């Protein structure tokens, strides 16, 4: 789903995504019927989780920080990736992901970045090569003093998946990404986006995201 500073035409209906409830606009797989009308957004934020979307929607995050927010509610489905690629191409805005600090979150970021291995033949039409990983980074856990009880020990599958990611060419090309995954492997910890709410519900919207965006703290 999608919400924020964007107006579209869906066949004959003009939809202002800023005025929708916390559920946002359900991204249509029939993108040929969608026309991008206007946007004064300054960036696009892609969220792994619906819970984070609801939090940002409740805070009307896009009013203070002009943006378009998308989520595929977990796995990066084709409709969401196609729509992201389309608005990215038409609006030419910076794009960021906010995912859990775990191998699956990093994998989801990689699917938006370059497409999935399973659909490699379609990847050029679905990828957003300029997307940046805003968080949650392993280094953020220390930087923002995330409490230990919000940090989760990695299991064997997590360790295996992290090692697999470190073997990927697209990770090796990005030294900051490689460093963050190596740190996760060294500490053997992971954390969910929700860990940030240890400091209160406003921490994500009022401090974490704005601070990282203003300081360029992404991968």
PLM features per residue range, with description:
Residues 1-94, 103-219:
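Nucleic-acid enzyme cleavage-core boundary/entry regions
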